């Protein structure tokens, strides 16, 4: 049987998607070869790539004045690519700091421009939270404002889209496609694929057309959004198999009823898990309710000495990858789109049994 996988990334993929990929692995649609052996410039592959983009545009309702790029290097490469693409005419940017990933992004950006860091973390009744925008010290003349919509490690998420009068840039790696989003409020959205999109190796960048001519002159051509847009994300050979698999995930999402439908399931999963944690004296979540992530749920045990046993028994119950990030410890359940409600119910049942045995 397939286990329930709570890994933060590379993460669970829908079983139906893996089964389709398995069927097509050796002989893609009767062509006598695997899609991973196919030229990225062949008519067949270009059709697969174009359909994946069209389906993503449909799922996210992406306006026509935005380019959708299928790139490589992970979201971490975008930490450099974004300032190099957007700070050519104005070297100032605001970065909102709420956790480990937004910190990595701002530290990289500091190599390329004059970065104003907004410390937006706070606490409410001892729980971590994000300050109201009225308390941020935003610049008047920034080229853009950057934030990480959902901090994968900390499990802290913005309750609203920031309202700024310059282009808004967001790392959506762990929350893309989990809830409806008004793309028109953003100048640029980026996301590593290996959480809610597909396998590792692919990175999605959605960028508004008017931002394509803002790059620095010393930018490597492979990182230049305008060049990638002009060449259909094929300045060099793209991550063809990851692109194809992501396309299968987009098809699967459309079959589920799209982002609105999957969002309802995600809310149900989060309500079930947080509800159980809050009702327990043994488990604790460190995040204030308004800023709890619906995708990444960190929690601690009342007795830290039981952590190894918890993970061991969870694995015996086919519940995998529940250890928290190495930088923070504790536990973390990542409940992305591909993790079914039954998986979260199985986790809650196990957590309850564990307390009765060891709590």
Swiss-Prot record:
This is Phosphoserine aminotransferase. It is found in: Cytoplasm. Pathway: Amino-acid biosynthesis; L-serine biosynthesis; L-serine from 3-phospho-D-glycerate: step 2/3; Cofactor biosynthesis; pyridoxine 5'-phosphate biosynthesis; pyridoxine 5'-phosphate from D-erythrose 4-phosphate: step 3/5. One of its GO terms (molecular function) is O-phospho-L-serine:2-oxoglutarate aminotransferase activity. NCBIfam families: PRK05355.1 (NF003764), serC_1 (TIGR01364). Signal peptide: none annotated. GO terms for biological process: L-serine biosynthetic process; pyridoxine biosynthetic process. Keywords: Amino-acid biosynthesis, Aminotransferase, Cytoplasm, Pyridoxal phosphate, Pyridoxine biosynthesis, Serine biosynthesis, Transferase. Its EC number is 2.6.1.52. One of its GO terms (cellular component) is cytoplasm. It comes from the Bacteria. InterPro entries: Aminotrans_V_dom (IPR000192), Aminotrans_V_PyrdxlP_BS (IPR020578), Pser_aminoTfrase (IPR022278), PyrdxlP-dep_Trfase (IPR015424), PyrdxlP-dep_Trfase_major (IPR015421), PyrdxlP-dep_Trfase_small (IPR015422). It catalyses: O-phospho-L-serine + 2-oxoglutarate = 3-phosphooxypyruvate + L-glutamate; 4-(phosphooxy)-L-threonine + 2-oxoglutarate = (R)-3-hydroxy-2-oxo-4-phosphooxybutanoate + L-glutamate. Its main location: cytoplasm.
